[in-house]
């Protein structure tokens, strides 16, 4: 397969960002067995491709096992993923579980199936990981998914909550990782097209995208078109949280604040832009001191005046 210089720059960027995310969050360690969840979409194909490339030159030893869940959807091309994974020479497992029938039975026609489908898949994945001895489970969510989920939870759930790049399962037996956490969806889509991955559409939810998620995604894309780099800035904000400037009493001891104890950026308390500036201080009785606010150029003139007065006259 012949690729251009632009493709190799794209591939290098994806591998570099994935490697950085793995390092920043300690996602993969020496001796790990990682279950790589394959849905047949662009994200999971890209994740497997990048992880296998990193595995070859990593300074540690870890094992990758690709997994696909055959949910018994009508018309599902069950031969596609096994043939592709076999051509790569990677270890893989195809798990058959008829979650499709359960979802269609439980969810009324026209309603979104994503929530129930996700819970059922999660249960099968955890069980498979345990059976295979995999201590890490890799999912293909990327930067845009994380930012999108953050706004969904804020707008419709009243929580500042996103998708963590790494978390422990409720039973504490597995660690779920998202190696593509730093990667932009547009880069993943470009890479998938260039690699000509055999994409498998989802018949359960592909034609009935969650309306709320779609609206949030459209909003973010509009912001990005208006101000390129905005999604990057939002994601950066998720990694640069200042609890003292939010309103969650579980994250910051507001009730324990007292004079002489807290070191808080006072400028931002009044809605000002945070910047570093040398401050004036005074001691003594506050009642006995008068404070006058003057322009910086006037301060400069006042400081220079005594020097000019001391100069000898001609």
UniProtKB/Swiss-Prot annotation:
[4Fe-4S] cluster binds at residues 114, 117, 205. InterPro entries: Rossmann-like_a/b/a_fold, TilS/TtcA_N, tRNA_Cyd_32_2_STrfase. A motif (PP-loop motif) lies at residues 39-44. One of its GO terms (biological process) is tRNA thio-modification. It catalyses: cytidine(32) in tRNA + S-sulfanyl-L-cysteinyl-[cysteine desulfurase] + AH2 + ATP = 2-thiocytidine(32) in tRNA + L-cysteinyl-[cysteine desulfurase] + A + AMP + diphosphate + H(+). Its cofactor is Mg(2+); [4Fe-4S] cluster. Binds 1 [4Fe-4S] cluster per subunit. The cluster is chelated by three Cys residues, the fourth Fe has a free coordination site that may bind a sulfur atom transferred from the persulfide of IscS. Keywords: 4Fe-4S, ATP-binding, Cytoplasm, Iron, Iron-sulfur, Magnesium, Metal-binding, Nucleotide-binding, RNA-binding, Transferase, tRNA processing, tRNA-binding. Catalyzes the ATP-dependent 2-thiolation of cytidine in position 32 of tRNA, to form 2-thiocytidine (s(2)C32). The sulfur atoms are provided by the cysteine/cysteine desulfurase (IscS) system. Belongs to the TtcA family. This is tRNA-cytidine(32) 2-sulfurtransferase. It comes from Cupriavidus metallidurans (strain ATCC 43123 / DSM 2839 / NBRC 102507 / CH34).
